[in-house]
Amino acid sequence: MLSAKVLLNSNFLRKQCPLCKSYFWTRRADQIYCGDQPCVPYGFIGNPPTKTSIESPAELRERFLRFFERNGHVRIKRYPVVARWRDDVYLVGASIYDFQPWVTSGAVPPPANPLVISQPSIRLTDVDKVGRSGRHLTGFEMMAHHAFNYPDKYVYWIDETTQYAYEFFTKELGIPQDEITFKESMWEGGGNAGECFEVLVRGLEVATLVFMHYEVKDGKYVELPLKIVDTGYGLERIYWLLKGTPTIYDAVFSHYLAKVRQKVGIPEPPADIMGRASIYFGQMDPEVIGLDKAYDIIAEKIGVDPKWLREVVRPQEALYVLADHSRTVSWMIADGVIPSNTGAGYLARLLIRRILKNLRVVGIDAPLVELFDMHLAELKREYPEIWAARDLILELVDLEEKKYREVLKSAPAAVKKALEEARRRGRAGLDTDDLVALYDSQGIPPEIVAEVAKSLGAEVKVPDDFYTKLAARHAKREKKPESPLVEMSKVADLPRTRELFYEDSYMRSFKARVLRVIDGRYVVLDQTAFYPEGGGQPADRGVLKFQGGEAKVVDVQRVGHVVVHVVEGQLPPEGAEVVGEIDWERRYSLMKMHTGTHVLIQSIRRVLGPHIWQAGAQKDIPSSRLDVTHYKLPTAEEIAKIEELANKVVQENLPVYVKIMPRNEAEAKYGFILYQGGVVPTREIRVLQIGPDEEPFDIQACGGTHLRSTGEIGLIKIQKVERIADGVVRFVFTTGMHALAYIQELERKLAEAAHIIGGSREEFVESVKKLLQRAEEAERRAKHYAELYAAVVAENLRAEQIGKYRVAVVELNDDELAKHIALAATRRDKDLVLVFVGGDRVTIYTGGVDVTPVVKTLREAGFRGGGSKTFAQGLYKGDIQTLKEALKKALS
């Protein structure tokens, strides 16, 4: 049983709902049901439970935050919607995501305790219900207060949390005490769990109070050292409750919807019809009974024709989807997501295409970029970061709409091919797996697949929860299974390796003691200057020297808290003292590459925009690569600007600092741009700063070895820029002497090319232009002479009369000349069948004769190929005489 003092002291009664069997608390002796959907209908639509006047979600948010500030909480800024500090999910789905796993595990203290926040969150778990149910959103703000109770520090728990909720709803919002129900439940998410109260008012869940004290491990609950108050008050839900509008969209997006309706010519729906439809939709699950059936049931309950109801409701659903999804997508892009076919970009594209699909169904053809821009104008006051990204958002949305239209053009052929493949496998139509494959591989929405299939005489059933299932498949990051170099059990008892490469990255040699030799090739030292592979930087190489021998170090890896050296040659005995010598030339080159990577990505961000995030990197010799998120291939001018800025930073010889900072302090000071290189799983963060404190050029969390100043890089040269995936661009670059060697090699090739065409390097471009002009003139003349020759050959063809057709077989191994001859010959003789034989290739041209029966007969003689009605080509390994006989047989 879950209870609280405020409930016991305020005359609440504990009851059990006869329908769902849940226990709940209410002050009303006559309340029978739990107060939640679907056990009770909405009771607030057209009838808000309070007269408290709140004119906007922004005003409600501020009242919530101030209420908790008055009650001893520290207000903190919202986190991004992209969870860059986590390696398990892409998007923030609740305010507690901000603190998982580092704070909730006890590894890192919270930024304040207790704290209050209003966190934009994204959940696609009910994406198919958005627009239909009247209450579901993909993007929402979770207002929340959190308290973190440690064994030695109690903040507050169930009693105080419930008291705060009770006072906020009754005193701050003026909702009568008898209207509030506390329903007991269990919550689980993000690897944690705990009992909870769901706060309900007139059938609507407006808050959840979670008392988190479990970690979920292998499906079992394990007690956490912390007891965490994790609350979630739905900003949009509460505002809807206060307004009593037919749907949540009409409350939250009222101004935007009014403008869109006016632009696209869709009238505002009858409020009573939409309100009643929303009430009934709230009590059923269309995914279970089917959307069409749901419409029929609701129409019957309201007393209207189902067809009329669809005509009224369906256009509104499309506009609701537009309103919700456009805000969610704008949040995502403003926080650095580029629509693509992978990761968070996949989810952004899914939402954009769902908007386009819904607008298409109801016949709205207004440019999506214009509809988005209207919404951005509405959002700019509450979310200035969205307005700051306006140009990027509109450019990406416009690009995505163009891609979608291309998809629609290619859909018929792709669906036809998929149906043919299904029939070959003995299936009459396409199943859900086929729909997923067509969407993931070619971006074709299932509704379009169904349309095309129907035109081809096949029925395709589109699941009502199709997009929800798609989103679930792509919501989590894929973790690559780790296989440690040696078993943890073999090093678990050893002390942590002292990491000399961090104390002095310029250390070339060092002394150490051998703690353990494992499996005849792995050596663990008490301290090392050998850098273990990590963060895209390869491991150091070198030697270990000891009395009586020497071992070559060929690899270095971290295994838990120790550094393991992979060696070849003689093995040092355990307990021996060794001298480690780093391959300094290689290490120093890698340091230049690593510091150069930081300089380069910041240069790319400053030229292409703040949406640039690292998607991967590998430092190597003589070249390194840096993958970044970007929606198109940079122009030559942009690449030149990036290279110029990077080398300007090198020339300025900016200092490079390493700071060890507490995680919270670093995040508060620098933001989540720290995690360009990925998640850092430590309580303290090693922060690399390029440039002085008053004006740093770049700041990132990084565990690599770096230079003392940018001048040591010497030179940064971009060698190649290519698009390696949808939304990902790769920069291949080099630094220092390797860059000089690359430039010298280019100059050598340029000089060689200039010599070949007869000119100097300085005159190379002009020489190439003249050479191309001569080549074009020669090609033009060759074509002219070929046409003249072809006309002569065509006029003198020796053709044999076979039936009513004339047949000529010509041995010629020149496709281009054959085309010219065929064009000239078939233009003057429509009954001509002209066959060219060149090696084992056969090509047939006609002036209008159907070659289909000819090809069929030739196949019997060994011909393998096909073509159109008047043209065929393929392979034939027989003799010409057999070919002629087959032609006679076919044309006689």
UniProtKB/Swiss-Prot annotation:
Keywords: Aminoacyl-tRNA synthetase, ATP-binding, Cytoplasm, Ligase, Metal-binding, Nucleotide-binding, Protein biosynthesis, RNA-binding, tRNA-binding, Zinc
Function according to Swiss-Prot or TrEMBL: Catalyzes the attachment of alanine to tRNA(Ala) in a two-step reaction: alanine is first activated by ATP to form Ala-AMP and then transferred to the acceptor end of tRNA(Ala). Also edits incorrectly charged Ser-tRNA(Ala) and Gly-tRNA(Ala) via its editing domain.
Family, similarity comment: Belongs to the class-II aminoacyl-tRNA synthetase family.
Chain residues that bind Zn(2+): H594, H598, C702, H706
Name of this chain's protein: Alanine--tRNA ligase
CDD domains with a match to the protein in the record: AlaRS_core
Biological classification of the source: Archaea, Thermoproteota, Thermoprotei, Thermoproteales, Thermoproteaceae
InterPro entries registered for this protein in UniProt: aa-tRNA-synth_II/BPL/LPL, Ala-tRNA-lgiase_IIc, Ala-tRNA-ligase_IIc_anticod-bd, Ala-tRNA-synth_IIc_core, Ala-tRNA-synth_IIc_N, Ala-tRNA_lgiase_arc, Ala-tRNA_ligase, Thr/Ala-tRNA-synth_IIc_edit
Co-factor remark: Binds 1 zinc ion per subunit.
Notes on the domains: Consists of three domains; the N-terminal catalytic domain, the editing domain and the C-terminal C-Ala domain. The editing domain removes incorrectly charged amino acids, while the C-Ala domain, along with tRNA(Ala), serves as a bridge to cooperatively bring together the editing and aminoacylation centers thus stimulating deacylation of misacylated tRNAs.
Organism: Pyrobaculum islandicum (strain DSM 4184 / JCM 9189 / GEO3)
